[in-house]
Structures are given as structure tokens and as C-alpha cells.
Amino acid sequence: MYSPLCLTQDEFHPFIEALLPHVRAFAYTWFNLQARKRKYFKKHEKRMSKEEERAVKDELLSEKPEVKQKWASRLLAKLRKDIRPEYREDFVLTVTGKKPPCCVLSNPDQKGKMRRIDCLRQADKVWRLDLVMVILFKGIPLESTDGERLVKSPQCSNPGLCVQPHHIGVSVKELDLYLAYFVHAADSSQSESPSQPSDADIKDQPENGHLGFQDSFVTSGVFSVTELVRVSQTPIAAGTGPNFSLSDLESSSYYSMSPGAMRRSLPSTSSTSSTKRLKSVEDEMDSPGEEPFYTGQGRSPGSGSQSSGWHEVEPGMPSPTTLKKSEKSGFSSPSPSQTSSLGTAFTQHHRPVITGPRASPHATPSTLHFPTSPIIQQPGPYFSHPAIRYHPQETLKEFVQLVCPDAGQQAGQVGFLNPNGSSQGKVHNPFLPTPMLPPPPPPPMARPVPLPVPDTKPPTTSTEGGAASPTSPTYSTPSTSPANRFVSVGPRDPSFVNIPQQTQSWYLG
């Protein structure tokens, strides 16, 4: 659900940053140890041995603090989503000790009961929310089936859905008290490995092979009492600590962080982590009316109440935090004045776009434009050579006339026919798309045929001997009928002459 990469910007949410120092480091070891044991049992159909379990425990305890904090950040993000929006502020204030404990209600499941979540990625075991709260903030080693051992305080008004850690307790039964005495007594006389019996216990055994009374209690875990108490009280932000200071984060005033120390450098994130970050952002947009406490003086990198630009960051585009904290990112570092102007522009719900054909991932602030400016700039250096420029307004008429000027003139004046009667030469239309074709072959040599030239007078006036029109030429033409005035120009074959129904003709009269 959340990015498995290093701490991305969605994991710097003020909700997470305020609660992260209060998470016990033992929670990471405990949840992962239970998952390892369950996976081993499903694969080998037998329980993990003490040596193997102890090796897994030592491996988890020696894990890097950054890995533990990333896991805690993802789990806190899941818990934030399961807490009702109107109770999230109270949850942060009560856990951090800035407000008396009050009920914090969670979103119920379909049956109206406490929800269950998986605390690890791709885990098949689910845990109740109240169990997770107790393990996470109190470090109590509870199993996933210990939900009935939890009790709510009398001050809790809604025991069914309240996930306030200060309202949740663990009931200790008589068996627990009874076993605690013997286990503690055995632990005080033994080393850090309670499963290894001491020499005194071996000597006290009867000769007939029966075990002593104290040896009937077998410690199933690999933690001793003192070790368990010690590791359960260690916060997850202790030890070597993270590579950033939690007090340097931009947040609201109720986090009691210094407003002057609001500068930190974010690790550079690739476009892949930005794309995956959008998936986690979508889960936070389904709860309207949330974040009533994000209206402080400073603006958190993950807060989405003051500007919608945090939810609208596209892959490959710099977020407001990336533009401000660009010491380690791929973008060039802007000046303080440019940083303030860019931050103001982001709060006005503008989305930056990198325009122009020369835009590169390493863009400077001068290439960042907003929708108020023209999107399309002047053309770049591409296709600027005059030899390869092409204007769509130019036609191929000049090209045809250049290749075969005679054919171009004949094609525009006389239509010649092939033996099949289909037209090949037509008048060139500059408005129609002309394909790039070779010039047509020259027309066949036709025998000169005298074309009848009609008189300007009707045929009846020529028989009456009337005077001809002065503008009409005086030719002696044989008398022909009007039907024979349609003449076809074709090859020398006489069968194609004067056959109007088979060829294309022009009216010359």
C-alpha cells in the first residue's frame, strides 16, 4: 500500500512525525518475530527451534534504526486512516502528553466491531487495532489472540471502538501471577538464556528421573524477563537515531516544535517513488473534513489542507517540498526570493508545468510557468534547417511542371484516353491532395482528324443562303447531323472513332 522505498514525503506527515518518537522499538521486533514463526510453521509444519528463534530475535534487534522507523511510519499511516478524522487531533495530543486522555474512536468494520489490520506488508495475520496500540505505544508482548485479555478503563465511554492507549489495559489472571513468581525466580538464578537449566536445578532432580516442580514450567519465548523489560521500554527513535532531526520538521504549533528550526534536507526521490506516493495519497482523500489541526503557522510537507498541490503532484514533477529543499534533489537550488515566490504560487492552487521543447528534468525556476502564461513557446532548434522545411500550403504543381512541362500542359488542356476508355489525364486541382506519383506516359500518337467547327448560325440558315456572321470563320465543312458533332479523340484504330457510348467525349459545337 505504501512505498517500500526510503522515507518518502508521505511518511513525513505531521501525524506520523509527532507520534514516531513514542513508538517502542520492541514493536518492530515483536511483530516480525511472530510473522517469521508463523511462516516457518506453515512451510516446515513444525515449530521453530530455540536456536533458530533466538537467531531471528538477534537479527531483528540489530536491525538498522532507519528500517524500523520506515516500518513504524507505514503502520502509523494505516492507523491514521482507521481513526475517525475528528479524533485524530485528540489522539496526537493525548499520546504526546499535551492533553488529558480522552476517547479516540476508530472506524468500525462491516459488523460495527473493532477493525483488524495487517501490521506487515504481505502478511496473512491480522491484529485488532487496540492490540496494535498497546504493542506499539506500551511495548507489551501480546499475541494476536489476546484480544480478550484487554480491558478498558472506567473513563472510556465507548469500549467497543476506542483505541486510546491510555484507556486500554491488560488483565492479569491468577495463573499469570503464579507463573511470574517461578519464572522470575528462575531468571534471577540463570543467565540470559532461561531455556538452559542451571547446574543447581539438575542436581536437585530426584534419582528416579522425575523433574522438579519448577521444571514443569517451560518458557516458550527467547526473551528473558530483564531483557524483555529493557527492550520494551526503548523508543524506536533511540539508539543511533534517524538521519534527520524530528524537531526540524515543519508542523503546526501544537507539536511544540521550534518555528525557527524549520529547515531540513529531504533525500532525493525518483519519479518511481513519486508515482507510488500517489497511491498512498489517494487513501487520504476519501475522508472529508479531516485535518482540523493542520492550520498552523508553518506548513507541513505532507499536509494537504492548505494547498491541493500536494495531492496533485504528477510523476516527474517537483513537489513544493522538493522545490524548497533542493540541496539533495535533482533540481537546481533556487534563490530565497524565488523559493518564496514559488511557495506562494503553490498555495494558490496552481500546478507547475514545464513548457517548451527544451524542457529537461533538471529545470531551473525560469522554465517553470503557470497556466496564466502561454503554454506553447516559440519553436526550438528542431526542424529549423531551411533545406528540410516543408510548407503544407505548397502543392506539387511546380514539381510536375519541372519534371515534364509538356505533360503538365497537355494534362491541363487535352484529355487523352487509354484503350480501356478510362481517363488518365485530368486537369490538376490544387485543392485536392496530390499523391507523389511519376508523370503519366506520353499520349499515343493520334492521326490528325479534322474537327468540325460549327457555324454561328443554325443549320437552317445555311441551306437558305443567308449571309454568314462576320465574326464566324468561313470554312467549308461537310454537312453533319447534330448527333455526329460529338467527336472522340483516340488512337489510330478507327473502331474507337465516333463511338460516343464507349469513350469519353467533349462537345465541340
UniProtKB/Swiss-Prot annotation:
What positions carry the motif 9aaTAD? 394-402
GO terms, biological process: BMP signaling pathway; cartilage development; cell morphogenesis; DNA replication; exit from mitosis; gene expression; glial cell fate specification; glial cell proliferation
Which residues does the record list as Phosphoserine (modified residue)? 258, 265, 280, 287, 300, 305, 319, 360, 469
For region Disordered, the annotated ranges are: 189-211, 259-345, 352-371, 435-509
**Which regions are flagged for Polar residues bias?**
498-509
List the signal peptide residues: none
Which residues get modified to Phosphothreonine? 471
Cited InterPro entries: CTF/NFI, CTF/NFI_DNA-bd-dom, CTF/NFI_DNA-bd_CS, CTF/NFI_DNA-bd_N, MAD_homology1_Dwarfin-type
Sequence positions bearing Asymmetric dimethylarginine: 389
Identify the keywords attached in UniProt to this record, alphabetized: Activator, DNA replication, DNA-binding, Methylation, Nucleus, Phosphoprotein, Transcription, Transcription regulation
Pfam families reported in the protein's UniProt record: CTF_NFI (PF00859), MH1 (PF03165), NfI_DNAbd_pre-N (PF10524)
Q: Which superkingdom, per the lineage?
A: Eukaryota
The residue ranges flagged as biased composition, category Pro residues, are 435-457
Keyword flag Lipid metabolism: no
Name its cellular compartments.
Answer: Nucleus
| One annotated GO molecular function | RNA polymerase II cis-regulatory region sequence-specific DNA binding
Disulfide links within the chain = none
Annotated GO CC locations:
cell junction; chromatin; nucleoplasm; nucleus
User: Any idea which residues the entry calls the DNA-binding region?
Assistant: 1-194
Quaternary structure annotation from Swiss-Prot or TrEMBL? Binds DNA as a homodimer.
Family, as annotated: Belongs to the CTF/NF-I family.
> What is the annotated role of this protein in its UniProt record?
Recognizes and binds the palindromic sequence 5'-TTGGCNNNNNGCCAA-3' present in viral and cellular promoters and in the origin of replication of adenovirus type 2. These proteins are individually capable of activating transcription and replication.
Domain-related comment: The 9aaTAD motif is a transactivation domain present in a large number of yeast and animal transcription factors.
Q: What is this protein identified as?
A: Nuclear factor 1 A-type
Which source organism? Answer: Homo sapiens (Human)
Supply the gene name.
NFIA
